[in-house]
């Protein structure tokens, strides 16, 4: 009887652990989608929520629980990716404009402002010079 009571209690209400796991799975799907679509200038909370199969409001709540926001995370990942591209040392460095587009920025000016705000230096300061 005790075993049946225990099973009944478990099935009656989802545990906090299950809720946490399902929330973590949603955030994982959302982050994976963001990483796969960084270059998409139309990437926004609605697109990410649709890809994660949740509402925008629910997705925003899950990201806030991680002390972030959906779009804040998108910008952070875009800027980190841009920094990595700028600092590659293969001698075939792309232009700042090209890197801005690859990372989902509409203009090089917008990218430069965001980059400077994040890293306190211009993108061209980080960029490895091209080989001639």
Residues of each region from the PLM?
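N-terminal positioning helix adjacent to the helix-turn-helix/winged-helix DNA-binding module
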Residues: 15, 19-30, 75-78
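DNA-binding recognition helix and immediately preceding turn/loop
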Residues: 26-71, 91-106
């Amino acid at each position: 009887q005790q075993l049946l009571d225990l099973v009944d209690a478990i099935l009656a209400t989802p545990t906090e652990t299950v809720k946490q796991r399902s929330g973590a799975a949603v955030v994982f799907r959302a982050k994976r989608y963001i990483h796969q679509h960084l270059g998409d200038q139309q990437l926004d909370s609605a697109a990410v929520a649709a890809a994660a199969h949740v509402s925008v409001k629910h997705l925003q709540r899950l990201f806030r629980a991680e002390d972030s926001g959906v779009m804040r995370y998108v910008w952070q990942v875009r800027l980190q990716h841009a920094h990595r591209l700028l600092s590659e040392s293969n001698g075939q460095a792309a232009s700042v404009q090209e890197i801005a587009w690859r990372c989902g920025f509409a203009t090089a000016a917008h990218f430069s402002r965001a980059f400077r705000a994040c890293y306190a230096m211009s993108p061209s300061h980080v960029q490895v010079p091209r080989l001639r």
